[in-house]
């Protein structure tokens, strides 16, 4: 690599779902690497959730970041006039099990993004769920299968990155580690029952590092499972959170052959990652309890 050349090699990216778990960490990763980011998501400035308000406050008035509501046609026009080195689509939470937004709406936005990528000849990176390759039928699998199908209909260079359970600061409140930590901070018992995919676990910032490095990598086209390369990591996390009794069953590692497995290089130690999530949740306890 030439001196001064960036690994990611990008100057401007578009992130659809800039306030989701992966999307928000990806925004921060890009800014840290000096990459300009245009972000779209559902929230409008005057009707934001408290958590998303806080997320945008933390980015602050950064010259590298521009946010538009996905419903804002003027915002879309600005986006469609720009040139991007890579586009990321992460409008759905890959670990969510139910209560999804209207899928027609999501597929409509995906279509619009595919058109943009076709016109500008830019690679589209889709964040999907590892459950798509599972034999079990779930709402998560059904939904992400549809999104992946929608992507294949276009004439666009794409990578689909299927992720397992993710953890770290800003983990969504419907997730098990979040619920356990919140219960511990409030000195209450956790009655939350896990429906999470327990086959593997990744720290969200490690995933974003990989996505930044490979955003425009055209050797990486197709469908990939991003994995830790370690055994029973989710279960180990449950043990560290003293919740062994809430581990229902080991998810069998059965995946379809459509995706290639990639063990990501950067692998944050589990204890360190959990401590980061704990420190974050201590700091924002009132926000999460509200």
Question: Which positions does each model-derived feature cover?
Answer:
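Mid/C-terminal beta-alpha module of Rossmann-like enzyme folds, strongest
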Residues: 210, 214-257, 261, 285-289
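Active-site beta-alpha turn of Rossmann-fold NAD(P)-dependent dehydrogenases/reductases
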Residues: 17, 91-92, 125-130, 162-164, ...
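N-terminal Rossmann/SDR dinucleotide-binding element
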Residues: 2, 6-82
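Conserved catalytic-core motifs of eukaryotic protein kinase domains, centered on the activation segment
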Residues: 50, 97-102, 135-138, 172
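Conserved Rossmann-fold NAD(P)-dependent oxidoreductase catalytic core, especially the SDR/UDP-sugar
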Residues: 86-94, 105-141
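Substrate-binding strand-loop-helix patch
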Residues: 169-172, 195-210, 223-243, 267-272, ...
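NAD(P)-dependent short-chain dehydrogenase/reductase
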Residues: 141-200, 204-208
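Amphipathic terminal alpha-helices
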Residues: 11, 257-290
């Amino acid at each position: 690599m030439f001196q001064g050349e960036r690994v990611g090699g990008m100057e401007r990216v578009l992130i659809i779902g800039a306030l989701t778990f992966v999307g928000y960490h990806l925004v921060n990763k890009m800014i840290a690497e000096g990459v300009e980011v245009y972000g779209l998501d559902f929230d409008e400035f005057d009707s934001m959730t408290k958590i998303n308000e806080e997320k945008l406050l933390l980015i602050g008035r950064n010259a590298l970041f521009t946010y538009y509501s996905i419903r804002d046609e003027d915002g879309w026009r600005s986006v469609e006039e720009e040139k991007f080195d890579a586009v990321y689509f992460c409008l759905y939470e890959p670990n969510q099990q139910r209560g999804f937004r209207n899928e027609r709406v999501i597929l409509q936005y995906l279509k619009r993004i595919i058109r943009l990528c076709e016109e500008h000849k830019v690679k589209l990176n889709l964040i999907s769920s590892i459950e798509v390759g599972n034999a079990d039928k779930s709402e998560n699998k059904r939904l992400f299968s549809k999104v992946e199908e929608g992507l294949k209909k276009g004439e666009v260079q794409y990578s689909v990155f299927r992720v397992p359970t993710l953890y770290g600061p800003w983990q969504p409140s419907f997730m098990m580690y979040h619920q356990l930590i919140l219960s511990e901070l409030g000195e209450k018992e956790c009655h939350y029952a896990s429906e999470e995919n327990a086959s593997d676990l990744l720290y969200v910032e490690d995933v974003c590092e990989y996505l930044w490095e490979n955003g425009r990598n055209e050797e990486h086209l197709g469908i990939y499972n991003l994995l830790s390369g370690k055994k029973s990591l989710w279960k180990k996390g449950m043990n560290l959170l003293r919740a062994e009794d809430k581990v229902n069953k080991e998810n069998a590692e059965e995946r379809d052959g459509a995706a290639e497995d990639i063990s990501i290089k950067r692998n944050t130690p589990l204890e360190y990652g959990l401590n980061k999530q704990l420190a974050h949740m201590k700091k924002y306890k009132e926000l999460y309890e509200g």
